[in-house]
UniProtKB/Swiss-Prot annotation:
NCBIfam families: Obg_CgtA (TIGR02729), PRK12297.1 (NF008955), PRK12299.1 (NF008956). It is an enzyme of class 3 (hydrolase). The gene is obg. Residues 159-325 form the OBG-type G domain. This is GTPase Obg. Belongs to the TRAFAC class OBG-HflX-like GTPase superfamily. OBG GTPase family. It holds the Pfam family GTP1_OBG. It is found in: Cytoplasm. PANTHER family: DEVELOPMENTALLY REGULATED GTP-BINDING PROTEIN-RELATED (PTHR11702), MITOCHONDRIAL RIBOSOME-ASSOCIATED GTPASE 2 (PTHR11702:SF31). Its EC number is 3.6.5.-. Its cofactor is Mg(2+). Residues 1-158 form the Obg domain. Disulfide bonds: none annotated.
């Protein structure tokens, strides 16, 4: 499946049905009076989040979306039926913007819904305009037009852990070894061309990890492919920085990524960060210890060591305990789907 994280679509909510102008016609009733019914409301266009979708691929093939119009009213005070709402499922983490680039809605939680295009109100039938001074009104109103607009959808993947690092650091191998993620793995730059999600289950708890591809020097300016995916790091609560321990200068490798995060969005470097020296099976134990101490002294952080032979249980266990503790201390979030 292709990964699409941005799309532009045209929305047209349903028009309201027209009201009806009619009069009661029955035998032996000379002046039956007005009995025109109201028109039905037009259908709304609703966006809703789904756990079963992780891309905006649907909108590559469906760029014009129209809801059903309301039906007109009829005699005997019968109201027209309202048009059906269209409910469009999008991934959690989707943001909706209007043509001016103003945020309409941020769909960042499960089972979130928002009406993006409001259907038109149905017209009023002439039965509603009968008064003591006007017993036979012929007046009725037309249904209102439904909203129409162009919107832009932008997906920012939400995960517990964002895996960052230079190409070939072993991010995809790490993700694949500890989750059920099916990622392409090879020894050349930019093997991973799109974000991959994986779910690890440790100590009966769930941990969602995202492999963020393409981070190199100048990524924030568009070099490599990192500028397309730096935005996904914004939605990761914690960063897992993987460094290839076979590199001559691991400090430079570390600072290269940190600099790109800072230049893209200075808030990113304030995210909690765990550091892993990867591919430790390719070096002597003495050399690994030396590099671990060097990086620990420089970053003032605990350094984990990993290799393809490890099951990474200790690293994941530490991460999941940290995330669980962090979530336990978080403020409860109450969502109102109609308060944009």
């Amino acid at each position: 499946m292709s990964f699409i994280d941005e799309a532009k679509v045209y929305l047209k909510a349903g028009n309201g049905g027209n009201g009806c102008s009619s009069f009661r016609r029955e035998k032996f009733i000379e002046f039956g009076g007005p009995d025109g019914g109201n028109g039905g409301n037009g259908g709304n266009i609703v966006f809703a989040t789904s756990n079963h979708i992780n891309t905006l691929l649907y909108f590559r093939y469906k760029q014009h979306i129209k809801a059903e119009n309301g039906n007109p009213g009829s005699g005997k005070k019968k109201s027209g039926s309202s048009g059906k709402d269209i409910i469009i499922k999008v991934p959690i983490g989707t943001q909706l913007y209007d043509e001016d680039g103003i945020l309409i809605a941020d769909l960042s939680s499960e089972n979130q819904k928002v009406i993006v295009a409001q259907g038109g109100k149905g017209g009023t039938g002439n039965a509603n305009y009968k008064t003591s001074t006007n017993r036979a009104p012929r007046y009725f109103t037309l249904g209102e037009a439904g909203e129409e607009k162009y919107i832009t959808l932008k997906l920012k993947i939400i995960s517990d852990i964002g895996i960052i690092g230079l190409p070939n650091a072993g991010k995809s191998s790490f993700l694949a070894s500890c989750t059920d993620s099916k990622t392409k793995i090879a020894d050349y730059p930019f093997t991973t061309l799109e974000p991959h999600l994986g779910v690890a289950f440790i100590d009966n708890r769930e941990l969602v990890l995202a492999d963020i591809p393409g981070l190199i020097a100048g990524a924030h300016l568009g070099y490599g492919i990192g500028d397309k995916f730096l935005k996904h790091i914004e939605r990761c609560s914690t960063l897992l920085h993987i460094i290839d321990c076979t590199l001559d200068d691991i400090i430079d490798s570390y600072e290269c990524i940190r600099k790109e995060l800072l230049l893209y969005n200075k808030e990113l470097i304030n995210k909690p960060e765990f550091i892993v020296l990867n591919k430790s099976d390719l070096l002597e134990k003495k050399e690994i210890t030396k590099k671990k101490q060097l990086l620990s002294q420089y970053t003032k952080k605990e350094i984990f060591v990993s290799s393809i032979k490890d099951n990474r249980y200790a690293i994941l266990s530490t991460l999941i305990q940290y995330i669980h503790k962090k979530n336990a201390n978080a403020e409860p979030y109450i969502y109102d789907p109609f308060n944009i």
